Amino acid sequence: MWEQPSIIAVRMKKPNTSPQASLKATVKTGATAASRAVSGFSYSRPFFEDLVDTALKHAKKLGATDAAAEASEGCGLSVSVRKGELENVERNRDKSLGVTVYLGKRRGNASTSDFSRAAIEQTVQAAYDIARFTAEDPFAALPDAADIAVPAEQRTDLDLFYPWAITSEQAAELAMACEAAALQTSKRITNSEGAGVSAQQSHFFSAHTSGFRGGYASSRHSMSVSPIASSPGKGQDMQRDAWYSSMRNAEELASPQAIGRYAAERALSRLKSRKIATTECAVLFESPLAAGLLGSFVQAISGGALYRKSSFLMDSMGKQVLPKHIDIAEDPFIKRGKGSSPFDEEGVKVQARQVVEAGRVQGYFLSSYSARKLGMKTTGNAGGSHNLILSSRLTKAGDNLDAMLQRLGTGLFVTELMGSGVNYVTGDYSRGASGFWVEKGRIAFPVEEITIAGNMKDMLKGILAVGSDTYNYGAKTVGSILVNRMKVAGS
């Protein structure tokens, strides 16, 4: 039996995000209500409202049946370092006005980054001309008035905007601290692919002639590092891994020291990886990878795949597609949530709902267009899903990673996947993978250069357990997932 280095025992403990270990102890964002009024944007909300109204009025003047317009602006700072030296500083700022014009059941789209009056009129004219020569689509239309989100004064503030007034020098200092923490974890951390800090923010305003008006500002900040571990001696082994933290509010980011150490622990744990013989066994997906399984499920029950009849979950409404202990909830109203929004991209009202209850599909993910194509009602998912939480009714508070490894017994614990490898028409699943071979509930040795394969229908129905080691990956929250059986192709 391969002897685990002591660092393996703590490798899967995610960085502490308590105030003591958070970025709040390192740098202040200054994200008070007063400071948020000074956003760093070049354009104000009233300016965007006037821009959009001008576009809509011109569309109606040209003879449009209906029209929609959206003005947006994004800006930010990205800094990367490597081996203690500044590598790249990038400031980005972009703006756009998008216009959609309807002529009956014909639709045209155009956009511009020029906010002058002449450019606005030219853009509307371009959208109008495209609509004139586009074939009719019986399902093309703005959302029904009954589905429009409530007026702005009735919407809940979801606390999505925390501008980070950080300089490039401060960002570089944080990135260097993150990389240094990784390099100082062990003498076997011998190199680095670099560390980075990003501060991004955006705002928009949209409206259409069915009565919707709305917009908001949001932010997304992150810090990451990718260290390289190596083992000395004959047949030198080198392994890379990475970790990151991403939040709306920079003060809630994990500290650079926690991110760096954890990334280093992950890289170290992969040293002396081996190949394994081809087999069939149970597979435990690490929680960040489990979010990918949830994403594949969402895509399969989304409107575009369903009306094109290109989904392995066609006609699944009300059917048992997951075990009875599995629930999936969607909640657009989580404060500071990465998938939170008071309305979808069409201005349609959103709702908290059960997408899956006791393993049965209770709802799809539909825009107004895909809903019409399917003869259903929109679910407020133009632009995709909102915050999703996958849970098991069997999960207990103590079902952490150690408990899930015990539940796995002997099998494969997957911590990295390569390639896309999902056929959404058939459900066939095949991806390159690496991770750890587990025997009797304990990690035996790291493995690499393997392929795991199965069918998504069988994988979903074969979920035995979901861990309490929940991880928020983007807009998806899920613990590690144990699947009963998959093919593992090795040497």
Go through the PLM ranges and name each one:
Residues 155, 300, 314-491:
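Dual-mode signal for accessory low-complexity, basic/Gly-rich regions
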Residues 90-103, 214-245, 356-357, 433-440:
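Short beta-strand elements
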Residues 78-84, 154, 200-220, 235-243, ...:
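Short acidic, glycine/serine/threonine-rich loops at helix termini
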Residues 13-16, 23-52, 56-58, 62-78, ...:
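Acidic low-complexity segments
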Residues 104, 147-163, 230-250:
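Residues forming anionic-ligand binding surfaces in small-molecule and nucleic-acid pockets
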Residues 77-93, 196-231, 359, 414-419:
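Conserved alpha/beta core surface patches that mediate binding of polyanionic ligands
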Residues 77-132:
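N-terminal alpha-helical targeting/anchoring segments
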